[in-house]
């Protein structure tokens, strides 16, 4: 049996896909909301559920030809990816540089935009019935959002520590290093 296609009237299967897409979106959204990001739990839940709904329409409208349904599904997934890309683009902001010396503008919202995009993909995957892949993708998304942030903090602390040591080495008087020889 094909995993993607459900028998007509399988409301339990359809409900499971929608509910799981909602849960995945809510979990990712909660992660973003706790970090004070511009898009939160409701936004991510709606994106995941909307993507699942969009891909479920051609799946349910299979009709006589599964080839036609797969073709329609392919176009639907492309449309969802492009549409959500525009939604994410609205979250990306370009601001004035922190200092005039750097001259480079600050960009914010990229991670939120990318997270909305991946949440739409997860909703589409779950809507297609590939819920195991959706859960694995959710795990790796949360790992990226939470785990990589910790790694960045550790790297930043290490850099700061190295800068402090280098600064102290420059500010020590020249004979301070020789006093320890006694």
Swiss-Prot record:
Q: How does it sit in the membrane?
A: Multi-pass membrane protein
Instruction: Give the location in the cell.
Output: Cell membrane
Task: Identify the keywords attached in UniProt to this record, alphabetized.
Answer: Cell membrane, Membrane, Plasmid, Stress response, Transmembrane, Transmembrane helix
Q: Where are the transmembrane segments?
A: 11-31, 43-63, 73-93, 116-136
One Gene Ontology cellular component term attached to this UniProt record is: plasma membrane
Q: What is its induction behaviour?
A: By sulfur deprivation.
Q: Spell out the InterPro entries in the cross-references.
A: MgtC/SapB/SrpB/YhiD_fam, MgtC_SapB_SrpB_YhiD_N
Family, per the entry?
A: Belongs to the MgtC/SapB family.
Show the PANTHER family listed in the entry.
MAGNESIUM TRANSPORTER YHID-RELATED (PTHR33778:SF1), PROTEIN MGTC (PTHR33778)
**Name of the protein:** Protein SrpB
The gene name reads srpB
